[in-house]
Amino acid sequence: TDRQLTVAALQGNAGAGGVFLSLAADYIYARDSVILNPHYKSMGNLYGSEYWTYLLPRRVSKSHVLSLTRNRLPIDATDARNLGLIDDCFAVSSEEFVNKIRQTAESLAKRPDFFALLQQKAHKRKLDEQLKPLQSYRDEELRQMQLNFYGFDPSYHVARYHFVHKIPHSWTPRYLAKHRRL
C-alpha cells in the first residue's frame, strides 16, 4: 500500500513463505538468533508463489538471489542483514525485541520525512509496475508451480507427503552433509 509503511518483525525462524511474506514489508527486523531458509527447493523442488521473484531481487543482488534459492542453505539474521535481506537484527530477548520494534515503528511514524518516504514508495512501485506488472510475476510463478503439481517430477508430492505426515528425512540431505562429498 502507498498509504502506510509496514514493518516485519521476525522473532522466530522462517522458511520459504515466511521469509518472502516478510519481504513484502518496507522494513524488516529480526532477533539475531533467527535462522532463515529463503528457498522452496527442499520441498521437492517447489518453485514458490509469494511474489518472491519480485520481492527478493529488490533486496539482494542477482548473484545472491541465485545462491539463496539454489543452494538451499539456511542463513542467520546477521548474514541476512549483511546481504540486505533484512534491515537489522538485534541481540535481545523476546520481550526486549517487541519493545525495540515498537520504538522503531513509533520513530518511523514520527520521522519528519514520513510523507516523503510514502511518496518515494509509491513512485518506486509505479515505476516497477511500468517495467513489469505484479500480475506478470504472479503468472510466471504459478506457471512454474503448475509444473510442480502436474508435471513429470513427483518429488514435490513425495516431499509434501513427508511434510504433512511429519516423516523425518532418513539422512541429512547431501547439500548439507558436505563431508559425504569426499
Region spans (language model):
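Glycine-rich beta-to-alpha active-site loop
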Residues: T1-M43
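Patatin-like phospholipase
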Residues: D153-H157, V164-L182
